[in-house]
Amino acid sequence: MARRSEIEAALRRLAPKIPPHEFSAVVDHALDSAGLRTASPENAAWLSLVSYLRHAFTDYEELLTQGYDRDSARFFVADEMRAMLEQWGVQRKLGTDD
């Protein structure tokens, strides 16, 4: 099975209600990220999903520009991310390291 197919299958299991456009963007992010090349398909799908949500659907980057450190910015967007994960049918809980 090709890497793309493995990540797609992992993402479908992880986020069964994710919209098609978002699905493609998350898979592309997982494949394009140098840091995820050696990750298991499941970890690549999860880490890419979390990163995509944080950057595309929250004020995370704005908080960083306002001078918040990474951990503080992540704290302030966590509830918004949890709500989106729930909408997309994700059962896995967002951890403090995510």
Question: Residue locations for each model-derived region?
Answer:
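Structure-specific DNA junction-binding interface
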Residues: 1-98
